[in-house]
A protein has these predicted regions:
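Alpha-helical solenoid repeat scaffolds
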Residues: 23-177
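Bacterial N-terminal signal peptides that target proteins for export
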Residues: 1-8
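N-terminal signal peptide c-region/cleavage motif recognized by signal peptidases
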Residues: 17-21
Length: 177
């Protein structure tokens, strides 16, 4: 065999071995983080906030860290600072976590009847129940621009709507709309 071909085979072999070793090293990169992630999730499940914060603090560069943040924020939506929730939603506006937290937060705000905060958190298209809560929020805050048109769209469907729509439909009837 020619020396150039032998050298080429040797180099290809080295590169193959190096890339295989890199794959093994890469697969071990997150081993400790995976363990910490599972422990942090268990701390959340067992309502051990101190342990959660200690463990989560070590995971800020871990790709699944936002899922821990989501779980933790969702668990304490009623007590969480609205700015903290807004920051998370904004940071994750293009992924399902932001969307899911926004919906959970909107439902929590509607349940609390915190209409000003509900309107501040509102964004985009939402399920009918949340649309009706938005209309309730508009009624209760006096921000009724566009309300009648939207309420009539919800009224003019060929099926019963969510119970959350009843106060909105009563508003239409009371105001002869």
């Amino acid at each position: 065999m020619q020396p150039a071909i032998r050298l080429l085979i040797y180099i290809v072999g080295l590169l193959t071995a190096a890339s295989a070793a890199a794959g093994i090293i890469d697969s071990d990169t997150y081993r400790e983080d995976r363990t910490l992630f599972l422990q942090a999730g268990k701390a959340l499940d067992e309502n051990r906030p101190g342990d959660y914060r200690r463990l989560a603090g070590q995971l800020q560069d871990y790709p699944l860290y936002p899922y821990l943040q989501f779980r933790e924020l969702r668990a304490r939506l009623k007590q969480a600072d609205p700015d903290e929730i807004s920051v998370f939603i904004e940071r994750h506006k293009d992924d399902p976590l932001g969307w899911r937290l926004r919906q959970a937060w909107l439902y929590a705000l509607a349940k609390q009847r915190d209409w000003p905060q509900f309107l501040a958190a509102w964004h985009g298209t939402q399920p009918v129940k949340l649309q009706c809560y938005k209309l309730q929020a508009q009624i209760n805050t006096g921000k009724t621009a566009g309300l009648v048109e939207h309420a009539l769209e919800l009224w003019m469907v060929g099926k019963s709507q969510e119970k959350a729509c009843d106060p909105v439909f009563s508003y239409l009837e009371d105001n002869n709309k």
